[in-house]
Amino acid sequence: MAQGLASSTHRTYKSAQLRFVNFCSQAGRLHPCGSPCPASEWTLCLFTTHLSSSLCSSSIKIYLSAVRSMHIDLGLSDPLVDCLQLQRVLRGIKRTQGSTGSSRLPITDHHMLIIYKSLCLSNHDHLMFWAASTLAYFRFLRSSEFTVSSLSAFIPLVHLSISDIAVDSHVSPSCLQLNIKASKTDPFRKGCCLYIGMGRPPLCALSALIQYLPLRGQSPGPLFLLSSGQPLSRALLTRWLKDIFAAAGIEGSFTSHSFRIGAATVAARSGIPDHLIQAMGRWNSDAYKLYIRTSAEVLAQATSMLSK
């Protein structure tokens, strides 16, 4: 039954379920058999209130989904059905917390130039980082699509590897093909091919990858490897970004997902049609609009246009 969940979802649920069990144990909400299931609506309300001190309402819903999954695994009925009191508690938490929105900032073309100037591309690790950064930016990649937490966590049928890269010409390349075998919105691993053309130097993913691939070699494993042989992880990527922008005097929350947000933002600013932005980011709905960040300057200019 565990195969019905993506591996990342399974890990998230497992952590949430452990927290639920610990809460029930400490709050005296366990059944005589020692199990928290089946959970009553009142138990779920107490758990939700407990979580609200450290989690936002959207994260709390993920924890409740994990509790539902626990019940399903045990062959029990869905504990969230017809829970009117629980729904009111959730609405109250959302109203109290307010709408904070995403704090993650976009990495735009301006930020990409800052990253480039901070690196020494004759260094293996720096070149690898630049190749990964440009690929993530120009192809709107999610961090899970190009990073791996460790060598032992690498799954050939899921993660990006050297065999997933192909160029149209080794003499004068003009296009690179990237095979994404699995992603957040592709749970059945149908896969998709992404294409990358030449950019304007130094912001060119094709050029960066062409430089990196000879250093990477043809050995099996993750596409992006440090000189030590360890893979580029999301944690390492985020730490490098934080250090680079801190050294440049730029404050804010930049993460591995900032490449995707920045790509959508710059694409919209550059006048790329909505349907192309949606296709480039592989969004199945209008959710891509949530990724576009509009600066205060642009909004101010827009109001002035109303008087023309």
PLM features per residue range, with description:
Residues 1-308:
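Extended, non-catalytic subsegments within catalytic or DNA/protein-binding/adaptor domains
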